[in-house]
From Swiss-Prot:
Gene3D superfamilies: Cytochrome P450
Co-factor(s): heme
Family, similarity comment: Belongs to the cytochrome P450 family.
Entry-linked Pfam families: p450
Induction cue: By fungal elicitor.
Main EC class the enzyme belongs to: oxidoreductase
E.C. designation(s): 1.14.-.-
Stated name of the protein: Cytochrome P450 82A2
A molecular-function term among this protein's GO annotations: monooxygenase activity
Keyword entries, A-Z: Heme, Iron, Membrane, Metal-binding, Monooxygenase, Oxidoreductase
Lineage: Eukaryota, Viridiplantae, Streptophyta, Embryophyta, Tracheophyta
CDD domains documented for this protein: CYP82 (cd20654)
Subcellular location: Membrane
Residues holding heme: C459
Length: 522
């Protein structure tokens, strides 16, 4: 749930909404005799609590403050829509176990239709036979442990290539006295992960030191960036359907244009793969596997090209954003906590040494690094508010009646920093996952820690995402000394967009830890 409104949009919207006050219908209210969750005071006519959520704080912080006042479950109004916000693990467990089927569908949002092939993508498809078939195919053909292992050479080669290029950049730009060079890691992590996912999905490698200005590469990245931005953008029509005709901010038009652009790009890849199949080329990326499996078939009446394009776009979007965001936060936290960095280097030197490059098989031995990634996801989950779901029937949560049609928002950030569960919850302490909290996992079985969501619609790419982050972070820290260029801690200001990203660039100092022969032999 992203709330992106510029000042002009808000101004025009509020004036129009007030003029249309008489149209307001108090739909979805709690019926007499049925006690709903506590309702946050101060809702505006028609626009509800939107002004609260558009304040200076990020929405998950604002909702966290409201939980301190109203309790672990409360209701708000987003335009004409009722929503309940749950903020502790007990309530989350009720939602994702007892009531999971009832909340397994998502609201029918404008972006899901205009960007996601009319809700054909698994991340927005309604819960039902079509969604179940998509998930089964995705899990068996791309995200199963055996398939993830089969593609390990792609991950390793992309990380190694990127490390080599970073070493060459260091050699060209290093300071003679200190031996350090300045790098901006947001871009480096982004291009590395983008290359990795594209190779696994469609066999493309768009970025290297020599091709970063390639027209096709830039076209693809621009379109994906726009998709990510628009998919999480708040539109007035979603909150107040009878005002959709106005298209405040022009977002719907942007969505149509971006959807068309991505459809053309992925369509070109699909045509290339069909040509390769005709020529007898044996390619084992996701697109080729899907063509072999689905060519000439339909899924619940859906055209095969739409299904394949939906799969590809889902994996690119979900596989890049969360991993990049986690890598940025992890590196920032490590630099702001020097003792953690020293422990990581010691573990890497003991388990891997400095005479060879890191392998995926080393990762299972890097227990402190695993704890660092886990603690990063606790403090900075990629989506601190869960993707909104919608109750398809009346339910009871925490003893309160929640009516059909109400939206569910889980404040993962608040759950992850609950002082009733975690000691010193706002501190970065990876050691907690090696001692008191070592048995808590991140895969939906322990509701105290849900960085990938919970229930039937938990993120299916957990294993691939964790493997990508661990390998990239371990390889980077193993290969380079890193240093904060300032005596002040790195700025940790958050920006709430598609993922909860770092507001400022991540500029740091690096120099090699290994001998030059190690980098050149990669």
């Amino acid at each position: 749930m992203e709330l992106v409104l510029n000042s002009t949009t808000i101004g025009v919207g509020v004036v129009s909404l007030i003029l249309l006050l008489y149209l307001f219908l108090r739909g979805g209210s709690w019926k007499s005799g049925e006690e709903g969750p506590p309702t946050v005071a101060g809702a505006w006519p028609i626009i509800g609590h939107l002004p609260l959520l558009l304040g200076s704080k990020t929405p998950h912080k604002t909702l966290g403050d409201l939980a301190d006042k109203y309790g672990p479950i409360f209701s708000i109004k987003i335009g004409a829509k009722n929503a309940v916000v749950v903020s502790n693990w007990e309530m989350a467990k009720e939602c994702y176990t007892t009531n999971d089927i009832a909340v397994s569908s998502l609201p029918d949002l404008i972006s899901a239709n205009l960007l996601c092939y009319n809700r054909s993508m698994i991340v927005v498809a309604p819960y039902g036979p079509y969604w179940r078939q998509l998930r089964k195919i995705l899990m068996s053909e791309f995200l199963s442990p055996s398939r993830v292992e089969q593609l390990h050479h792609v991950r390793v080669s992309e990380v190694q290539s990127s490390i080599t290029e970073l070493f060459r950049d260091w050699r060209s730009n290093k300071n003679v006295q200190s031996g350090f060079a300045t790098v901006e890691l947001k871009q480096w992590f982004s291009l590395l992960v983008f290359n990795m996912i594209l190779r696994m999905v469609c066999g493309k490698r768009y970025f290297s030191a020599s091709t970063s200005d390639d027209e096709k590469a830039n076209r693809c990245v621009k379109a994906v960036d726009e998709f990510v931005r628009l998919a999480a953008t708040f539109t007035v029509g979603d909150a107040i359907p009878y005002l959709r005709w106005f298209d405040f901010g022009g977002y719907e038009n942007d969505m149509r244009e971006t959807g068309k652009e991505l459809d053309e790009i992925i369509g070109e890849w699909l045509d290339e793969h069909r040509q390769k199949r005709k020529m007898g080329e044996n390619v084992q990326d996701l697109m080729s596997v899907l063509l072999s499996l689905l060519e000439g078939k339909t899924i619940e009446g859906m055209n095969v090209d739409i299904v394949i394009k939906s799969f590809v776009l889902t994996v690119i979007q979900a596989g890049t954003e969360a991993s990049i965001t986690t890598l940025i936060w992890a590196t920032s936290l490590i630099l702001n906590n020097p003792s953690v960095l020293e422990k990581l280097k010691a573990e890497l030197d003991i388990q891997v040494g400095k005479e060879r490059y890191i392998c995926e098989s080393d990762l299972s031995k890097l227990t402190y690094l695993q704890a660092v990634v886990k603690e990063t996801l606790r403090l900075y989950p990629p989506a601190p508010l869960s993707r909104p779901r919608e109750f398809e029937e009346d339910c009871t949560i925490g003893g309160y009646t929640v009516k059909k049609g109400t939206r569910l928002i889980t404040n993962l950030s608040k759950i992850h920093t609950d002082h009733n569960v975690w000691s010193n919850p706002l501190e970065f302490k990876p050691e907690r996952f090696l001692t008191t909290d070592k048995d808590i996992d991140m895969k939906g079985q322990h509701f105290q820690l849900l960085p990938f969501g919970g229930g039937r619609r938990i993120c299916p790419g957990i294993n691939l995402g964790l493997q990508t982050v661990r390998l990239t972070l371990a390889s980077f820290l193993h290969s380079f000394e890193i240093l904060n260029p300032s005596t002040e801690p790195l700025d940790m200001t958050e920006v709430f967009r598609a993922t909860n990203t770092k507001a400022t660039p991540l500029e740091i100092l690096i120099k090699p830890r290994l001998s030059p022969s190690c980098y050149e032999s990669i």
